């Protein structure tokens, strides 16, 4: 049986929390963190992987690159920054799309054909833009 592999773009608060939630629920055998700050992704992955050693099931978490998307079943987009006081989620749209500008070609190049879940704010608008740009 093919093992379930989930890739998370963004190793900040939301991406890392998403990874830990997936680990606790046993939703994947392999979780990959990708972040523009590779050292951050590696650090978060090492901490979470240590925690995973206590689970009654096998789960591996590590940092990786966009080539990991080729055989992933799920991609979670968690790229973005936190809201500042007084900002709405919609105020983050321009910034979120700017951050995704370099990521979209990398996703296309990876030949990813799984499920894309976008939790980058504003999630509904960013998700629709990703759907249109990725086909």
Regions found by a protein language model. Give the residues of each.
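Rossmann-like NAD(P)(H) cofactor-binding subdomain of soluble oxidoreductases
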Residues: 88-134
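Glycine-rich Rossmann-fold phosphate-binding loop(s) that bind the pyrophosphate
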Residues: 11-12
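Conserved NAD(P)H cofactor-binding loop of Rossmann-fold oxidoreductase domains
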Residues: 79-81
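N-terminal Rossmann-fold NAD(P) dinucleotide-binding loop
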Residues: 15-16
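Conserved S-adenosyl-L-methionine
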Residues: 24-30, 135
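Conserved N-terminal Rossmann-fold NAD(P) cofactor-binding segment
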Residues: 36-73
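Extreme N-terminal starter segment of soluble prokaryotic enzymes
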Residues: 2-6
